[in-house]
Amino acid sequence: MTTLAIDIGGTKLAAALIDKNLRISQRRELPTPGSKTPGALREALTALVEPLRTEAHQVAIASTGIIQEGMLLALNPHNLGGLLHFPLVQTLETITGLPTLAVNDAQAAAWAEYHALPDDIRDMVFITVSTGVGGGVVCDGKLLTGKGGLAGHLGHTLADPHGPVCGCGRVGCVEAIASGRGMAAAARDDLAGCDAKTLFIRAGEGHQQARQLVRQSAQVVARLVADVKVTTDCQCVVIGGSVGLAEGYLEQVRAFLMQEPAPYHVALSAARYRHDAGLLGAALLAQGDTL
């Protein structure tokens, strides 16, 4: 059975066909529309999947935000251009005429990455550091989603009570500081207006402010890793996302984690499936891997 998998992120939309052996083909990408209207997202999704829908038997969506009874509810609306509510499952079923499943993108990625780990790993946490910061928790071999779909939204745990206001309305969230959007918002002087990708380039060139912004992000994520270790007693933490997978970033997170007391230490690794983890995890769930 072929699955049309869709990944809805803060900066891009991706889609691909995935077969029962998790082989990916015909991968496509489009920018996430900046408009706040549901119509703009609907049009973008239609353009994204139209060339693929006739070859699929079902649709699986991994999306930023909270997925609740098929609705996309944004905890931080800034990550989707201000969109608050969107009938995600209904929209894709209308566009494709196919049965559709939707799950949070970090939860989906956690499920994919869990399947790539050795069989003796039953407890793991996935953290994505990208436009926002998200997470997924697997406990005793089961993916935790929560009754309201909120489980694993680790980016909205507290990093600094005196920090910047997060898009969710809370002050000092991990996401407000460590995410690509948070790093860009903190950039000043000659870096003002730069995106996270540019900040990493400038940091690599030795720019002191850029290096400090990257260090601050890595330190906040390391503290988050320590928190999830002591909360879940996970056997490992997998880091993904465009920031999380940037050159040298994981090494900085690991170095900061080693400064914490020993009980907070945990094995860290980069996402095996990298930017395809959300697509693959959603496909796994649609193909019968139960939550």
UniProtKB/Swiss-Prot annotation:
Enzymatic reactions: an N-acyl-D-mannosamine + ATP = an N-acyl-D-mannosamine 6-phosphate + ADP + H(+)
Disulfide bonds: none
Keyword ATP-binding in annotation: yes
EC number(s) given by UniProt: 2.7.1.60
Residues at which ATP binds: 5-12, 132-139
Molecular-function annotations in GO: ATP binding; N-acylmannosamine kinase activity; zinc ion binding
Family: Belongs to the ROK (NagC/XylR) family. NanK subfamily.
Subunit annotation: Homodimer.
Record PANTHER family: N-ACETYLMANNOSAMINE KINASE, ROK (REPRESSOR, ORF, KINASE) FAMILY
Function: Catalyzes the phosphorylation of N-acetylmannosamine (ManNAc) to ManNAc-6-P.
Name listed for the protein in its UniProt record: N-acetylmannosamine kinase
Organism phylogeny: Bacteria, Pseudomonadati, Pseudomonadota, Gammaproteobacteria, Enterobacterales
Gene: nanK
